[in-house]
Amino acid sequence: MQEKISKFEDFLTQLQQNITTALEQHETNAAKFISDKWQKPDTPDQKLKGYGNSMIIEGGEIFEKGVVAFSRVHGSELPPSATAKRQELAGKSFIATGLSLVIHPRNPFVPTSHANFRIFIAGADTDNPIWWFGGGFDLTPYYPFEEDAIHWHQTAKNICDKHDKTYYPKFKKWCDEYFYLKHRDEYRGVGGLFFDDLNDKSFDECFNFVTDCANSYLDAYIPIVAQRKNIEYSQKHKDFQLYRRGRYVEFNLVFDRGTIFGLQSGGRTESILSSMPPMATWKYNWQPEPGSEEEKVYQYIKPRDWIK
């Protein structure tokens, strides 16, 4: 099992380089991804041990802020967020390896994107370790274009269909349901793919699906960035982007499993919260003007069948 974990780690660290390099090619000023390698000390007072590399870009003309973060951690006991629906895992040691990214563009016409790909092994030090994969990618537009959502979902479907034709409808629905702000009765964006507890096939089959899915993120996102990054925008557009970013913050702090897991398990707070946007605003009881571009967004981000 250790060999398989290391193989996935090697894939993720290479993927991190591929993604940051591809994004930097679209940046028009001197902003670059900065590498912040870290290691948790292996001492008794540390609940979580391990290491990682958080790559951050800030202040770009295209990417106002972005993080592509790798981590490999282990602990003596899974936190409550990981065992709430799987009580049989309570008290088990674990290893978790993953890559998580969030890209916050400066231009309100370029959507925010998020992706995460991970493996968990519970009881890795026992004769019967329990493994599963999780991950996916989702898109959060502020001023949406239907062709962007169609391209995003078509890319997702193509990858899923290559492995299992039941995956796309199942993981799309899961994504729609997961990225939902219950307290607002709003969806975060136009979705994509979300899956967890993936071990329905052999390890190699699941590994191949997850790595193909991870490799397809750039195919899904880069054409949208290239198409929208030079659209002119006004302060009104920027203000609405900042307002909608507030919803992003609310979701990450209240509902996101990865954030909650990281904080509950004693993870590296600076890396966990690096996905937060550089700026966001909240307005009391604000409502978009009827018939405005802003009002249309709320109809657009409801779940729908993007691929006819």
Curated annotation (Swiss-Prot):
An annotated GO BP: protoporphyrinogen IX biosynthetic process
Highest taxon of source: Bacteria
Annotated binding of a divalent metal cation, by residue: H104, H114, H153, H183
Primary location: cytoplasm
Annotated positions binding substrate: S100, N116, F117, R118, G266, G267, R268
Chain positions covered by the region annotation Important for dimerization: 248-283
Catalysed reaction, written as an equation: coproporphyrinogen III + O2 + 2 H(+) = protoporphyrinogen IX + 2 CO2 + 2 H2O
Enzyme active site: H114 (proton donor)
Site residues by UniProt (Important for dimerization): H183
Top-rank EC class of the record's enzyme: oxidoreductase
InterPro entries per UniProt: Coprogen_oxidase_aer, Coprogen_oxidase_aer_sf, Coprogen_oxidase_CS
Entry EC no(s): 1.3.3.3
Cofactor needs: a divalent metal cation
Any Gene Ontology CC annotation: cytoplasm
Location in the cell: Cytoplasm
Keyword line: Cytoplasm, Heme biosynthesis, Metal-binding, Oxidoreductase, Porphyrin biosynthesis
One Pfam family hit: Coprogen_oxidas
Subunit organization: Homodimer.
Matches recorded under HAMAP family: Coprogen_oxidas
Function comment: Involved in the heme biosynthesis. Catalyzes the aerobic oxidative decarboxylation of propionate groups of rings A and B of coproporphyrinogen-III to yield the vinyl groups in protoporphyrinogen-IX.
Assigned protein family: Belongs to the aerobic coproporphyrinogen-III oxidase family.
Listed name of the protein: Oxygen-dependent coproporphyrinogen-III oxidase
Organism of provenance: Francisella tularensis subsp. holarctica (strain LVS)
